[in-house]
Structures are given as C-alpha cells and as structure tokens.
Curated annotation (Swiss-Prot):
Cofactor list: Mn(2+); Co(2+); Mg(2+)
Major enzyme class: hydrolase
SMART domains, sorted: HDc (SM00471)
Protein residues bound to a divalent metal cation 1: H46, H74, D75, D140
Keywords annotated in UniProt: Cobalt, Hydrolase, Magnesium, Manganese, Metal-binding
Name by which UniProt lists this protein: 5'-deoxynucleotidase HDDC2
InterPro entries: HD/PDEase_dom, HD_domain, YfbR/HDDC2
One GO cellular component term noted in the UniProt record for this chain: cytoplasm
Amino acid sequence: MAAAGSCSSAGKSLLQFMKLVGQLKRVPRTGWIYRQVEKPESVSDHMYRMAVMAMLTEDRKLNKDRCIRLALVHDMAECIVGDIAPADNIAKEEKHRKEKAAMEHLTQLLPDNLKTEVYDLWEEYEHQFTAEAKFVKELDQCEMILQALEYEELEKRPGRLQDFYNSTAGKFKHPEIVQLVSAIYEERNSAIAENARTSQT
C-alpha cells in the first residue's frame, strides 16, 4: 500500500470501491420493508451471517474458503441497484442485466487480479454451476427464514411471515442446512402453538 500522505490512483479507486460496498450497510432488505418489519436488516447484515454460516460448515467436500467468499460477494451488486425483490415484478433477465452492469462497474475499481476474482465469484453464484454456489444459495434462503423467525419473535407475532417459509419450502437439500432448517421450524411451530393456546384463554 502507498505510504500515508501519498495518494495513488489505485488508492483512490480502492477507496471508491470500499465506499460503494459500504452502501450495503444502508440498503435495507426489501422483503422486510414490504411486510412492514420495523428496523429491517441491511443487505450487509444478511451477507455477514451467511458468511458465518459458511465458515461453520463441516462438509469436507466443499471448499469452505470459497463458500465464505461467495457469501460475501453474492449480493454485492445491490450497493448500486438496491435489493430487487420478487414483489418488484422485475424479470429475472432484467435483474441479472442490472446486477451484471453493477458488478462490472464495481470491479473496474479493483486491480486486475482482484477484479477477475470478485466478478467470477459473483458469476459462479449467479449461474449455480458449482457445489459451493449451490450450498451458498441454500444458506441464502436458510438465513432468510431464520431472520423471519427472529422478527416474529421480536414482534411477538408468531406465524406472521409465513410467505417467506412458503417461498423456500422444499428447496433445502444439504444435510447441514436441512438440520438447521428443521430446528428453525421446530422452534417456530412451538411458538405458533403456544400463541394459539394463550389466545384461547
């Protein structure tokens, strides 16, 4: 890195990249806004926990480091295009086009080797052509329903965010994720049943 006091063009570009990525801390997850969740999480909140989940995998057939990198990159384009949700009714092809352009702009700010690495990670996740990308996609959906559970608990309104569970039903295949999803469902179903009992008394 350049010494303090000097300012190279590479340093300026890296600063611009970091500031753009920093926007993810201020981009709320759109699905929660549409459901009137108070203080919805940011995109970076979501990606951070996904990266932790990836770090905790014990599946030796997966490249753990790659899974963590995929988790950290997969929604990076949203610092420019925002979080495009299914309810926005934007075609999948158009969403991909917007996010591709955003990633091309973002990665142009990086040195050539890093530019290729970051962009290729995003493409790998988008096209789902590796076991790691498929695993991280399941983490993405699992983290979402875990967050839905937490919002229901915080609001003391168990069962309110059912549509997030409906949208992910049957999509979990990896044994570790299936185990975590089962624990989420068990805790949620218990809360729903308890709420039904207390509301009848």
